[in-house]
Regions:
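General "foldedness" signal
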Residues: 27, 40, 57, 61, ...
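C-terminal, well-folded lobe of enzymatic/effector domains
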Residues: 35-45, 49-58, 67, 87-97, ...
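Secondary-structure transition/capping motifs at alpha-helix termini
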Residues: 32-38, 129-135, 193, 250-254
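A cross-family structural signal marking well-folded subdomains
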Residues: 1-120, 226
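Short, well-ordered alpha-helical packing segments
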Residues: 27, 44, 48, 140, ...
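Residue-level marker of positions within ordered structural domains that often coincide
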Residues: 31, 52, 124, 192, ...
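Betabetaalpha-Me/HNH-type nuclease active-site subdomain
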Residues: 76-215
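Aromatic-acidic/polar surface patches that form glycan- and anion
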Residues: 19, 176, 236
Length: 255
């Protein structure tokens, strides 16, 4: 029945990759309300939040142990389930509200396994403001550094936060380069074509190839210096905060 069920949160669970600890909750859900798609949707929404936090915060602590009693006590009341899970995760801190925000705020999101999923959900959020698109696909999906990584041979081009020697400072390298505010979903072919180009050229390519709204909105965060668009710490900070706020609100049990 799960395979045949149609629901956006079921799709989200599958996109995340369903961990073993989630299946017993799904089985119990079908036991209690196999004929109530609304209730199943509510359950999957709760489970997606738990699963996302477990994948984001890949702790050695065992989330399944903490959820076992809640699973045993679950008798079909989703509000009680949600409150019990929220309380338990906040008690254990690892997957609680505060630590979830800390991880979303991390300065090295590039190495997180869920970065594609976060940006994919962010894209859904941007697109749903205008019209509804639940599923979109990008050929050879990759993560683009808007302010580029330093090329192996050559220097960083103009329009970025570089010094007179065309280098990033230590703060930029450690806190800005790999944070979520500087990362974007892009197709592999597009990524290969823009690489280490000046920001003016990169911005033009985003606007010419607006497959994703997150590409089109970069112009809203960019600043102007000497008549040309630039992508520096201030822009990254602003976009970073917007995506972190989106994440805190999206993977929150209280919404």
């Amino acid at each position: 029945k799960f395979e045949l069920f149609r629901n956006e949160y079921k799709d989200y669970l599958e996109n995340l990759g369903i961990s073993a600890f989630v299946y017993p909750f799904i089985i119990k859900g079908f036991k209690f309300f196999s004929d109530d798609s609304g209730k199943l949707g509510e359950l999957f929404k709760v489970l997606e939040i738990v699963l996302f936090r477990a994948k984001l915060i890949n702790s050695r602590a065992n989330i399944q142990e903490r959820l076992n009693k809640i699973l045993l006590d679950f008798e079909g009341d989703i509000d009680i389930l949600k409150e019990d899970i929220k309380k338990k995760l906040n008690e254990s801190w690892y997957w609680g509200d505060e630590n979830t925000k800390n991880y979303l705020d991390d300065t090295n999101m590039y190495n997180f396994g869920v970065v594609n999923y976060i940006l994919w959900r962010y894209e859904n959020f941007l697109q749903n403001k205008g019209y509804s698109i639940q599923n979109f696909s990008i050929e050879n999906e990759q993560i683009e550094h808007i302010s580029p990584k330093k090329p192996d041979n050559g220097v960083i081009e103009n329009g970025y936060d570089i010094d007179e020697n065309k280098n990033y400072d230590d703060e930029f390298e450690s806190e800005y380069l790999h944070c979520i505010g500087n990362l974007m979903l892009i197709s592999g072919s597009h990524n290969a074509s823009i690489g280490n180009k000046p920001f003016t050229d990169k911005l033009e390519s985003y606007n010419k190839n607006p497959l994703l709204n997150q590409q089109a909105e970069i112009k809203n965060f960019s600043k102007i210096e000497n008549g040309l668009p630039v992508w520096k710490k201030e822009s990254i900070d602003e976009r970073h905060q917007k995506i972190v706020n989106f994440g805190v609100e999206t993977w929150n049990f209280d919404k």
